[in-house]
Amino acid sequence: MLRVLVVALALTVLLPGVAAAKEPAAVWATVNVCDTAKQPDALGLRASMPGTPKGARLSMRFQVEYRTTDGRWDDVADADSGWRAVGTAKGAPVEYGWSFTFAKRSTPVTLRGVVKFRWRQGDRLPRQQEAATEAGHASKAGADPAGYSAATCVL
């Protein structure tokens, strides 16, 4: 009986770690600049992606959407960074950012970012993901003011 208890206890300790190891690390995106004194009429986006598998070429694409009167999100014309090479995976998360500047509007508009992530190994594309901006992500650089993180921006 003691042997069964020890085995059961060992499995409960070891199995969660095995399950967690199989899950891909999370991506995130945030608004880190929203119409500040230093960056008027600007929307800054920052994102992070896992730096695995090692050796993969990492790319991000930043796009902006606006909230329609019926609550849907539609693309903002010409608010697309195109694919940006952000580095080679070395085992640590990689952050990158992109800013967009807009003409002043007579009525406010709510904006958010959508970031697409791509991992490439040679000609293979083993992983692709997408994330909409959300609050609560401290970025390593570029936030105005420092530490700013939001899901949306009203311009």
Q: Residue ranges of each PLM-predicted region?
A:
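Low-complexity, Ser/Thr/Pro-rich intrinsically disordered linker/stalk segments at domain junctions
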Residues: 2-7, 11, 16-155
